[in-house]
């Protein structure tokens, strides 16, 4: 029988209820648990309160309640260089990036993992809702967790096999309400703390205002697909494909339907808009994606596979045929049914039943082999 007390697990503790309960459960299972608070961003909010200071206080309280040692580590430099600069660069290209995917790949499961190994960790853990399965050959597979509503495999889709082998997901078989119940029953300081929302480093702040601090906004024309000027946009980076709110456009003589962003023309600095949720320009039949990462490793040959996919968080799976090209590590994905608002810069993540296979970054979308002007 394995003696868990000889297995050290370093837990990334955010000051939230999920990572608090992860640390508690591991401690109850007899592991040698160490808590670490990551400071990735100088996050003074709009009211002048540094939320990281409050969060670290909560980590200290919970660590004391559980009876584990704790540390704080600053990854602001790593975060800026590996996540935030990528985030800004994608927006400059007119794309809509997913910084949470990159944060997991580069910070939580790279910088933090390296730090944990320096603390003689055998494994790391956090508060993610995900699960793993080890096959007979010792290969670790990423699986969906019990709580499908909180499933975070989408955000973990760029992790490697080496990273996955070093991770424990204590919340794999729990629902969020059960996690809250455990925290309350155990009297943890974070038991009733509300979940954080928004992009990991922006938090609750106004996104438009935040982005304008780092990228100069360039206003331009809002045009219909046939070139008619209908308004002015504040800067292409503020809009995403399929967006309805914030356009400031009213009904026309022809239609009372709301307006939606259906494309961008980066060269002309024009935002392409059209009335109607079901605008044909919002529907893609296929896409190209690059930077493919499979949890079980990259195949050395081309692969064609029928599976399902998500191209945004929390959307229901859609049926696809994936064509992997080993030469340049890309995929061409064909949708079983036309897919609405496929967005360059976002992650597409592949599933085979309960298993998450991995993901890639969307580059282009097509409608019947004609490229949609999404960037």
UniProtKB/Swiss-Prot annotation:
Catalytic reaction list: S-sulfanyl-L-cysteinyl-[protein] + uridine(34) in tRNA + AH2 + ATP = 2-thiouridine(34) in tRNA + L-cysteinyl-[protein] + A + AMP + diphosphate + H(+)
Q: Where in the cell is it found?
A: Cytoplasm
Q: What CDD domains does its record include?
A: MnmA_TRMU-like (cd01998)
Q: What does this protein do?
A: Catalyzes the 2-thiolation of uridine at the wobble position (U34) of tRNA, leading to the formation of s(2)U34.
- Region annotation (Interaction with target base in tRNA) maps to 98-100
Instruction: Spell out the residues of the site Interaction with tRNA.
Output: 128, 346
Annotated S-S bridges: 103-200
Its protein name is: tRNA-specific 2-thiouridylase MnmA
- Where does the record place the catalytic residues? 103, 200
Q: Which species is listed as the source?
A: Lactobacillus johnsonii (strain CNCM I-12250 / La1 / NCC 533)
Matching HAMAP family: tRNA_thiouridyl_MnmA
Pfam families cross-referenced by the UniProt entry = tRNA_Me_trans (PF03054), tRNA_Me_trans_C (PF20258), tRNA_Me_trans_M (PF20259)
- For this protein, the Enzyme Commission number is 2.8.1.13
One term of GO molecular function? ATP binding
Report the main location listed first in the record: cytoplasm
Domain of life per record: Bacteria
UniProt keyword NAD present:
no
Provide the gene name from the record: mnmA
Q: Binding of ATP: at which residues?
A: 12-19, 38, 127
- Looking at the record, which segments are called Interaction with tRNA? 150-152, 312-313
